[in-house]
């Protein structure tokens, strides 16, 4: 029973799709961290500077309810997350477009077909006849 499960898992794990997916998840996670850092540490401070030294991390709205309790809406962090999402989405779009262009080039290449057994035999006979002349 356990041996069958292990064998089935090996077959699944060795398939290209499972390995490709695992590599994609790891690379995607690392790429997400890079883009998050780009947005938080470079883009948003520059945008904040252009908008009059606004710090997006601290942008918030405090709402007081009727009973006096306060709710803080941190919309600055939300704006950063939206910019983060847009950059990641656009980067993935460009990457997929690049991969698709490579696939199209591969599809456009004419495939050289392997000669059949008969064609190979005829070519050998032709070569022998040329040599005998």
UniProtKB/Swiss-Prot annotation:
Keyword Transmembrane helix among record annotations: yes
Membrane topology: Multi-pass membrane protein
InterPro entries for the chain: MS_channel, MSC/AndL, MscL_channel
GO molecular function, one term: mechanosensitive monoatomic ion channel activity
Localization in the cell: Cell membrane
Keywords carried by this UniProt record: Cell membrane, Ion channel, Ion transport, Membrane, Transmembrane, Transmembrane helix, Transport
Name of a matching Pfam family: MscL
Main location: membrane
GO cellular component terms attached to this protein's record: plasma membrane
Coiled-coil ranges per UniProt: none
Listed SUPFAM superfamilies: Gated mechanosensitive channel
Residue ranges of the TM segments: 19-39, 79-99
Family: Belongs to the MscL family.
Assembly information from the UniProt record: Homopentamer.
Stated role: Channel that opens in response to stretch forces in the membrane lipid bilayer. May participate in the regulation of osmotic pressure changes within the cell.
Protein's name in the database: Large-conductance mechanosensitive channel
Organism expressing this protein natively: Clostridium tetani (strain Massachusetts / E88)
């Amino acid at each position: 029973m356990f041996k069958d499960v292990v064998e089935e898992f090996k077959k699944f794990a060795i398939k290209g799709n499972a390995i490709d997916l695992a590599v994609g998840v790891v690379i995607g996670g690392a790429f997400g961290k890079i883009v998050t850092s780009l947005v938080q540490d470079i883009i948003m401070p520059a945008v904040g500077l252009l908008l009059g030294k606004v710090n997006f991390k601290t942008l918030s709205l405090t709402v007081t309810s009727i009973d006096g309790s306060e709710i803080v809406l941190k919309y600055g962090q939300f704006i950063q997350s939206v910019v983060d999402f847009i950059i990641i989405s656009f980067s993935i779009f460009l990457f997929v477009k690049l991969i698709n262009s490579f696939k199209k080039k591969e599809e456009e290449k004419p495939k050289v077909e392997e000669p059949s057994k008969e064609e190979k035999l005829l070519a050998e006979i032709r070569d022998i006849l040329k040599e005998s002349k």
